Amino acid sequence: YREINLNLGCPSGTVVARNRGAGFLGTPRELEDFLDEVFEKCPLEISIKTRIGMDYMDEWAPLLKIYQKFPMKELIIHPRLQKEGYKGTPHLEAFAEAVEALQCPLCYNGDITSPESLTQILTKLPSIDTVMIGRGILQNPGLLQELKAASTESVALPSCEERLAVLKEFHTSLLTGYQEIMSGDTNTLYKICLLYTSDAADDL
């Protein structure tokens, strides 16, 4: 590997309960000590994915001061609090604060589900270096093709048949992968069902 990505963005309750993922943001002193050691001893490039805090918006400014100290390759920001999960609207103003405070490349993550949503975000935050698309791809495996079609006239929007083919290929690949690493059909089916059950979306 040439790069390590530290995930401080996962809001899952089971992860946060162990002070991992976004749970680490709740102990900023320990986080800073951890990053001090990692950046001192790790020979690889390091990027970080982060939320903007655990419970309150005023947690973001102290976190930015911590991130200012370290020569990270990239900071990937999902501008929601951990307690918000994936609900509500991303706090774009928090990303704008990072643009002012940090010198490292910044990547935006969160609620990119269509060409229109990407355009809105880029219009409000024109200084974004890159974007990361996560759950939007799980919801719509054809999203990348739709984004390409929206950005250039040489790429056509996928037809219904093409979208269905992509979905089937995605589903088959995912099912096969789960079957290889999980024990029993029940566990495999549970993981697959999470993709298609909106009430269980936060468990992904």
Where are the language model's segments positioned?
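C-terminal helical cap(s) of enzyme catalytic domains, especially alpha/beta-barrels
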Residues: 140-155
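Long, well-ordered amphipathic alpha-helical subdomains in the mid-to-C-terminal portions
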Residues: 164-195
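Alpha/beta enzyme core
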Residues: 1-4, 8-13, 18, 30, ...
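Glycine-rich beta-to-alpha transition loops that act as phosphate-gripper elements at the mouths
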Residues: 50-56, 107-116, 135-137
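Short glycine-enriched, charge-decorated loop/helix-capping segments at active-site entrances
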Residues: 19-25
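Catalytic cores of alpha/beta
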Residues: 58-63, 112-129
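Glycine-rich phosphate-binding active-site loops on the catalytic face of alpha/beta enzymes
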Residues: 8, 79, 127-144
